[in-house]
Amino acid sequence: MAKASESLDLSVNESTDKALDRDCTTLSRHVLQQLQSFSADAQDLSALMNRIALAGKLVARRLSRAGLMEGVLGFTGEVNVQGESVKKMDVYANDVFISVFKQSGLVCRLASEEMDEPYYIPENCPVGRYTLLYDPIDGSSNTDTNLSLGSIFSIRQQEGDDSDGQAKDLLTNGRKQIAAGYILYGPSTMLVYTMGKGVHSFTLDPSLGEFILSEENIRIPDHGAVYSVNEGNFWQWEESMREYIRYVHRTEGYTARYSGAMVSDIHRILVQGGVFLYPGTVQNPEGKLRLLYESAPLAFLIQQAGGRATTGLVDILDVVPKKLHQRTPLIIGSKEDVAKVESFIQNGH
């Protein structure tokens, strides 16, 4: 009896130790551990990730008070480089990222979905060897209805001095990314990232003001029941995509989930498996999502988790953009589900 009690005590202690170790693993500590196998000149990435986390905290705080503050909800009346009406939260979140990095000495350039051209920080150049590419608010149409939103980020190393200010070195494939991830603003605020060594998630503990490790080395299931797509665009798609939707409608075991915020939908698929689709249309075959700010960062992360991301014909990470704001179709998620969508598209071609 004493031995059984002793064994139980050891088991409880081990469980407690693991929980305590996890609770003590902050984002900054975890990133430093990841960087142990990187070269010495990559250590700035720890400070860079901390700045991204700070931007996420500031945006999360603003969103949590959105219904109580003036000038947070609604549109600005302006149109961005994408031709889309700009939400007030789009502007605020974009300004937050600029402000957080402006005096950091870490990045020379910021490239955002919301800005026509990269934002240069001369005082950080050439010391700041990195470029941050980001979508400050993904799913901004959800802002006024208190639904989930996100931010997407990607880190690349600057190549050359960019003396002509054209940022041509960014027009390379997604395999040049050093790190990528997203921040999900939902019932809790989560930060999920990869540095090419697995995918790791952190939850913001409001009492500590720290992102604490939630799960390490996340693996996406090979197959999932969820398909996530805006079926309101059904009649605008190519016939091959419509055939895929008909297939999931008549096949038992599939369920549709679509929130209007890609980060939210991708996070569900990362955890539960399935596929997210944002295909091109007959009139706009290039699709809607921006390659550098949305598709490539999420493709890097999902592939690190064991999933896949494609245009339907080409791996997203192999697409070389011709311009900063280039769009691309996106099919991303569990490898078996992505392959199923590909089979319809490729047979249609």
From Swiss-Prot:
It catalyses: beta-D-fructose 1,6-bisphosphate + H2O = beta-D-fructose 6-phosphate + phosphate. It comes from the Bacteria. It comes from Trichormus variabilis (strain ATCC 29413 / PCC 7937). This is Fructose-1,6-bisphosphatase class 1. Gene3D superfamilies: 3.40.190.80, Fructose-1,6-Bisphosphatase, subunit A, domain 1. HAMAP family: FBPase_class1. Its cofactor is Mg(2+). One of its GO terms (molecular function) is magnesium ion binding. Binds 2 magnesium ions per subunit. The gene is fbp. Mg(2+) 2 binds at D135, D138, E294. Substrate binds at D138, G139, S140, S141, N230, Y258, K288. One of its GO terms (biological process) is reductive pentose-phosphate cycle. PROSITE patterns: FBPASE (PS00124). Pathway: Carbohydrate biosynthesis; Calvin cycle. InterPro entries: FBPase_C_dom, FBPase_class-1, FBPase_N, FBPtase, Fructose_bisphosphatase_AS. GO terms for cellular component: cytosol. Its main location: cytoplasm.
